[in-house]
Regions:
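Nucleotidyltransferase catalytic core that binds NTPs
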Residues: 1-154
Length: 154
């Protein structure tokens, strides 16, 4: 689960729990971004966000935190982070957990085709979302990119 985690909150943890249970995941790795690409800068620097994420995850045995993006001083693109993770763990199957609203703009991310090749996207549908619209967007991305998308209700 990637994100700015500025700050990490209960919604992140609950979403991770729902997805892990719904999809039978062994673990969830939280990856705080280092240099933000799409969001405005904030008061919390990468090291602070990393420490906040570690504190939020606590002693949950299914959760861990990776510093892969925080240690990279350059721009971090999801496609490149997934590629690094895949190269380090070639036999693992990766799920990238996002809020369902992210499906609306994932095509605008750097190399979306590579993202969809390297992982299953787990789109978390929160209360109040138009589930039909989320499913329609997931179907569109599946058709256009061959994306593997699991919609999970939280």
């Amino acid at each position: 689960m990637g994100g700015t985690f500025d700050p990490p909150h209960l919604g992140h943890l609950i979403s991770a729990e729902y997805v892990a249970e719904a999809l039978g995941l062994d673990s969830v790795v939280f990856i705080p971004t280092g240099k933000k690409v799409y969001k405005e800068s904030s008061a919390a620097d990468a090291a602070d966000r990393m420490n906040m994420t570690i504190a939020a995850v606590g002693d949950n045995p299914k959760f861990s935190v990776s510093d892969t993006e925080v240690l990279n001083e350059g721009v971090n693109y999801t496609s490149e982070t997934l590629e690094r993770l895949h190269n380090a763990n070639p036999n693992a199957h990766f799920y990238f957990i996002v809020g369902a609203d992210s499906l609306d703009y994932m095509e605008d991310w750097h190399n979306p085709k590579k993202i969809f090749e390297l992982c299953t996207v787990a789109a978390v549908q929160r209360k109040g979302f138009d589930n039909a619209a989320v499913q329609a967007k997931a179907d569109f991305l599946k058709e256009r990119y061959g994306a593997d998308i699991e919609c999970v209700q939280a």
